[in-house]
């Protein structure tokens, strides 16, 4: 089993309300010469979770960090005109993303929860401050000081 030290949140950089699905991302990533959809999970606007790359395998979503991370992508991230980065998550996406991050952090309690832009400041992705939004997930699932002494 590989060591996962990062849970990285991305956006697909599509217009608000885009009907994009995992198979669309898969097709695009294959056109770039990748094996398949580089994200482990994709969250369309309806809030469902779609599986991308198997979690136990290394994805292709964040240069220099793929080997030790899980990649989650929500569909959206651009304004209605498709030109300006914007947090376009639907309420369903927000709820699903929170649940998925909580589940992943329980499986990988030492993993940091970050946005793509936290690792590459030239990116706007995912268009919101991931660490600030999910700090309570880290606090809730972090080991207690007693557990850390073991």
Per-segment meaning from a language model:
Residues 57-58:
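A short acidic/small-residue loop/turn micro-motif
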Residues 1-40:
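Cell wall/extracellular polymer interaction/catalysis modules
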Residues 31-32, 61-63:
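Short Gly/Pro-enriched turn/cap motifs at secondary-structure boundaries
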Residues 33-36, 109-112, 149:
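Secondary-structure boundary/capping signal
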Residues 1-12, 45-49, 54, 65-68, ...:
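Basic/polar, cationic surfaces and motifs that engage anionic cell-wall
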Residues 140-150:
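Single conserved hydrophobic/aromatic residue that forms the stacking wall/gate
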